[in-house]
Amino acid sequence: MSYFYRLKLMKEAVLVKLPFTSLPLLLQTLSRKSRDMEIKNYSSSTSGFILLGLSSNPQLQKPLFAIFLIMYLLAAVGNVLIIPAIYSDPRLHTPMYFFLSNLSFMDICFTTVIVPKMLVNFLSETKVISYVGCLAQMYFFMAFGNTDSYLLASMAIDRLVAICNPLHYDVVMKPRHCLLMLLGSCSISHLHSLFRVLLMSRLSFCASHIIKHFFCDTQPVLKLSCSDTSSSQMVVMTETLAVIVTPFLCIIFSYLRIMVTVLRIPSAAGKWKAFSTCGSHLTAVALFYGSIIYVYFRPLSMYSVVRDRVATVMYTVVTPMLNPFIYSLRNKDMKRGLKKLQDRIYR
């Protein structure tokens, strides 16, 4: 019996012995291999990117879609309600609530830049984003996110003036000054985003176009570049320190001054009242900056895909979803504004 004939018989025997129950597993494996080959072919033949998302497990895609859809709707509806509630109640027409209404608007924009594309990718096979779409997402993500941080700093300054210098509050925090603070926050944030996107657009991308994240963030995209990214990484770290740390230090300084002033108040009731006006804002600051500091303020060599995804979900989805509850649950003025809005709707 020839060698080739014996080899043919052995192959047929193996096929006969293959259990029928293993066929679905075999088909699933072949399908996955085919999909992986399609992704590799796509990434090597176009200028687009593949977003791997939160998980590559096909069985988790629909549950994750449902979870993030609910979180997005809660964030959108909650922040949308905050804005008319503030503007419908004249007693909420103060600098603090002016900044809060704009923070709610920025939170809506911030989550909308990320989550809708994320939801589409949960139900998609290839999870494609174009090169221009990736840069656009990066630009608006940073613009709205940085504006959020400056608005949180503006709210801290408002509390500082209200508690430490109440007699000059109306002069310092008059509407014109508040509007200038808002315009300054937006201008600095958009200039920062433009600079970052121009820097990223100069990078070259070779074989792999697969981003190990659920959106186009700076560090995952830098990881893909076949250019020398040492200078880009240094510039990114430096200007990130300038843009993000500056409002954070402003918040820290404001609350240190507030703490010193409050501790000098003789009555316990007065101390509690002063601290209670800052509690919700401090909670929002801790949620927002805690995850941002973890994600951005460490070297690229320490980048971890899983931990970064979890931390990024915290400040891109969870914090905007929780902010309306944080600012309204223990706030009598906001509760009154929401009640007045409800009465107008159902009148």
Swiss-Prot record:
Where found?
Answer: Cell membrane
| Highest taxon of source | Eukaryota
- Residues on the membrane's Extracellular side span 1-62, 117-137, 196-233, 297-309
Query: Pfam family of this protein, just one?
Result: 7tm_4
Q: What is its main location?
A: membrane
Cytoplasmic side, ranges: 87-94, 158-176, 257-273, 330-347
One GO term describing the cellular component: plasma membrane
**Does the keyword Cell membrane belong to this entry?**
yes
Membrane topology of the entry = Multi-pass membrane protein
Task: Spell out the disulfide connections.
Answer: 134-226
Keyword annotations of the record: Cell membrane, Disulfide bond, G-protein coupled receptor, Glycoprotein, Membrane, Olfaction, Receptor, Sensory transduction, Transducer, Transmembrane, Transmembrane helix
What GO molecular functions are on record for this protein?
Answer: G protein-coupled receptor activity; olfactory receptor activity
Give GO terms for biological process.
Answer: signal transduction
Question: Carries keyword Glycoprotein?
Answer: yes
What sections of the protein cross the membrane?
A: 63-86, 95-116, 138-157, 177-195, 234-256, 274-296, 310-329
The positions flagged as glycosylation sites are: 41
Q: Which family does it belong to?
A: Belongs to the G-protein coupled receptor 1 family.
Q: What does this protein do?
A: Odorant receptor.
Q: What is this protein called in UniProt?
A: Olfactory receptor 1L6
- State the taxonomy lineage: Eukaryota, Metazoa, Chordata, Craniata, Vertebrata
